[in-house]
Structures are given as structure tokens and as C-alpha cells.
């Protein structure tokens, strides 16, 4: 990255063929999973006319993902990571084929959809953990900030494209097309992933998988730096659950259907801008302090969002939250990867990703509870300002993270 530029440099895709292969595979995978994410709720709703059944499928898949992240973390620290990645992707694709075949039946099975959702949630997240653990070896720890920013852009771009494509396919060909293309896309990702070099794990004694996972929890609690990073990540994810209040807040602002879409687009847009303007972030001497301040700032943006007098100001607050949370997330990712021992990378990445899954669910549940006692405006504001207070307390308590200095700021090869 050019030291004089705030803009993200994409040269890592040119100089590191292995990372380029991962970038391509991840983008195709995100689009494929997006097609699945559109098709499953629509098919269940059409079959059952029950939003509860749709919610059950999401809950079951989320539970399978959580277990997959835990198991994947242990496997990524025990077995050659390339094999784990390929096995997880291939097995996940088999589940997509099953969904496609089921959708083509005269009477599709609801039980099959639930079971295959569990299958795909487990194996998809298992591969994600191994891929995250392998990233430092693919790009070098000095390039992790740049790699994280490029990955964030990939996720945001894929998350925008896949629902649009999924909706078009549903309108023109039905859910079977979504499942079929998701399966094809998943198997296509195996082609670039096959070009990856071997990714062996450091030699370490064999131990019971549960004891290995317990060792990761002990490390997390014993290391204030890594523990603080994980805690901040969970709180930021909880704050992003404010989206469950968008429909109710849109009514108070008298927004049209088209304008409501801007609320949902604001945070991803802000996050994309944060990734694009992260050029100097890798050279910060006090990344921990920047992480803490940007996290508190993002909570403040959520607190101000709902009390804005006009919806445009609310959208700006959400975009600001997206930008600040992207800065915090990039620093979390980089410090986690650089400060975690190699033999713990799989399990720590699994735990860090799992707190994103659970943090979102906890945040949505808390906002739902607040919504039962107060207005949507009050719910969003109380949650945001409450998190500001917690963030300020953590700014004081997490001294090791606040004082952490990079003796030689991360540089990149670009």
C-alpha cells in the first residue's frame, strides 16, 4: 500500500497467486450461498405459509454453523488445512445438489430442507475457519490488513449481487435454479482452491478435541489482548442487529418502500468505504486505541440514528456506523491473526467468527425485548447509548489493548 495514500491497494491479488485463488473462490462461494439464502426461506414459505417455519430453518442453520466453526477450528489446528478446505467445500456442494433434487420432486420434503440446511451450515462454516487460519501463511502476516480489507470488499460486493441474482432466478425459473447454480458455483470454487500450496499445521501433541477447544477458551481468557478483541467484536455485531427495527422506524419517518432499501444499504456502503479507505490503517502505531475509539464511535452512531428528525440523517448515521465498524473489524482481524500463536490460529478464528454469529442473534433478541417495553425509537437509542457506556468502560478496563503498540507497523508488499 502506498504510504501516502488512504486508498486500498489491490496489488496483493497480483503479487500473491494463492491469495488470488482464495479471493476468486470466496467471491463465487458468497454468491452461491446468497442464492441459497434467498431460495430456502421462499421455498419453505411457499410450502408451509408459516413464518415460524422459516425462522426455524434459519435458527437450525445458525446452530449448525456455530458447531461447524468450533469443529473447524480444532480440525484446522490438527490437519493439513488445504485438505480441510477442499473437503468442506466439496461436501457442502453435495448438500446443494440434494436441495436441487428435492426441489424438482413433485412434492418436495420439508424435513429434507431442514436436514440439508443443517448439513450445509455445518460444512460451510467448517471450511471458513480453515481458510481464515491459512491466510497468514498465504499472504504473510505483514500483509494481513490489506488482505482483510480486500476480503471485506469481496463479502460486501457478493452480498449485494447474490440477492439480486437470486430474486431474478426465482422469478424466472423457481428455487431449483438457485440450488443448482449454488451447487455448480460451490464445485467451481474447488478449481482455484486446488492450486493452493500445502498448508501444514505446526507439530503439536494430539489431544482430545474437547480438551483442544477448552485450551482455546483458556488462552482467550488468559490473554487480555485477544480476549478484549473478541469482546469488542461481539459488541459491534450486537450493535448491527439494529436492522430488525428498520421497518418500524421507517413507518415513523413515513418512508416509501424504495427509501426503506436505503436503510439496509447504508451499513454495507459505509463498511465498503471503510475498507476502500484503509490504506493508512496498517501503519498505525496504536491499533488497539484506534479499535477502541472507532468501536465507541460506531455505538454512538447507532444511538443517534433513531432520534434523527429526518430519515436521510438516519441513513448517514448508519453509514457512519458501517465505516467505523469496518475500521474496528479490520483491526480486530489483523491483531487476532498476528498476535495468535500459529498452533492456535484455527481455534481462535473459529471462536472469533462464532461470536459474530452469536452476537447478532443476542443483539436481535435484546432489541426484540426492548421493543416489547418501549417504542422502536427508544429501543434503538437505549441500545446504542447503552453500548457507548459499555464501550467507554472497556476503554478504561482493557489497558493492554489500549496501550498496545506495533514496534514496526505492518507494511505491505504493494
From Swiss-Prot:
Protein name: Enterobactin exporter EntS
Functional note: Component of an export pathway for enterobactin.
PANTHER family assigned to the protein according to its UniProt record, in alphabetical order: ENTEROBACTIN EXPORTER ENTS (PTHR23513:SF9), INTEGRAL MEMBRANE EFFLUX PROTEIN-RELATED (PTHR23513)
Organism ancestry: Bacteria, Pseudomonadati, Pseudomonadota, Gammaproteobacteria, Enterobacterales
Transmembrane segments: 22-42, 56-76, 84-104, 110-130, 157-177, 179-199, 219-239, 257-277, 288-307, 314-336, 357-377, 379-399
Topology with respect to the bilayer: Multi-pass membrane protein
Origin species: Salmonella paratyphi A (strain ATCC 9150 / SARB42)
Gene it is expressed from: entS
Periplasmic side of membrane: 43-55, 105-109, 178, 240-256, 308-313, 378
Cytoplasmic side: 1-21, 77-83, 131-156, 200-218, 278-287, 337-356, 400-414
Subcellular location(s) of the protein: Cell inner membrane
SUPFAM superfamilies: MFS general substrate transporter
Superkingdom, natural source: Bacteria
